[in-house]
Amino acid sequence: MMKRTTIAGGAIATALVLLALAVGYRARRQDVEPAAAKPPAVTPPAEKEEEAHQSFLYGRIDTIDGVGYEGRLRWGGDEEAFWGNYFNGARKDNPWAAYVPPERLPKESHPIEIFGIEIANPERPANLGRLFMARFGDLARIESHGRDVQVTLKSGAVFDLDRFSASDFDDGVRVWTGSRGVVDLDSLRISAIEFLPPPRLGAAPGRLQGTVRTRQGDFTGFIQWDREECVGSDELDGHTAGGKLSLRFDTIHSIARRSLDSSHDSSLVTLLDGREIVLSGTREVGQGNRGVYVDDPRFGRVLVSWNACERVVFSPGGSGPAYGDFPPGGPLTGRVTTRAGRRLAGRLVYDLDESEVTETLDAPSQGVNYTIPFGLVASIVLPGPEERGAQRARVTLHSGEEVQLECAGDLGAGNAGMLIFIDGRQRPEYVPWADVEQVDLDRPPAMYPPLGGRKITGAR
């Protein structure tokens, strides 16, 4: 009996010592790292099934070892997921430069200064390297060829990209297969990607949609927060007084930017049940935020910078465009009017770069970057020399919508000029950008977003 009592007493003492050690360890751990805040219990709304699934990327990926994977796709594992999202890269070279006489190729100056005094201003040929950007819905196939990536559009146009220069290809792809589960494929294993209309898919997350409010107006459409998060199961990360907190986007009603100054940037998050939470301390909810993409059907896509964004209000997401909603593009055609009064009509190459209606006009306005497919654009009217103070171009769309864009990006002085392939002539006409007064573009037979509104005749 004494032995049992002694053993029992020893066991109790040992347990008390272990309990004290555990409490002490927990207290020290809390001093070093605050416990994560418990996410509020909010039930996400029910997701619509089949209709929304047609907007997800889908295709077949062949690997270098001969294995094929078919299923729903998401770039980089947690980035681009829909046909309206963009694939980005850098062109290997510029084939259009060969059509311009060497002495007429654009030049740029690089002033040399010593102690603030300019001692020379040498000119050198301008950099004609160009980036590539196309919606996944406009793509037919992507192939890997060593250091090159070859992209084929639905129209049949082929573009060679430099694999190691800012290419989305190297982000890898996540595939939801039927038989192998979820597979993450490194780009080094990928030989080719063929895009296909999706069949009936299993469970898939809902898409983010809503309205982004800015000082210059509202933009409504499908949303990518911080250029990445685009489905309801993605999470918004931040810190509260209680520690780190992650919120699923499908539990959020709105996000409002709160900025006292650059060092005290935060976001006010309102949940679907009305509760409000202030998040700070991460890139996603502060100055490090890279902006909000909005697929606004009026313009194609806009990127609202963090400083321009005032509030995002989410709304139930409908079905986005399916693969078949993106018709094959075609050559860019229209007329160029020079400042000297010449009018040149034919197939166009804009900025010694864009030659297809599915390629985009990229220019900013008050913290919002517009990415407008050329097939939506009816005319571009540039400010005259007497309007230098304004420095805004008037862009009219085939829908009748008009937007004033800053003379920067594709509308800026760095534009390399235009080629006009006139019927019956062996070589195209080249017009430097400084000589361009107006560009009128022909209306394509079909586009996405669909062409609405009246037909614009290009009246001056």
What is each model feature region?
Residues 15-17:
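N-terminal alpha-helical "arm" segments
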Residues 1-2, 460:
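Initiator methionine at the very start of the polypeptide chain
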Residues 9, 19-460:
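Compositionally biased alpha-helical segments
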Residues 2-13:
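N-terminal Sec-pathway targeting helices
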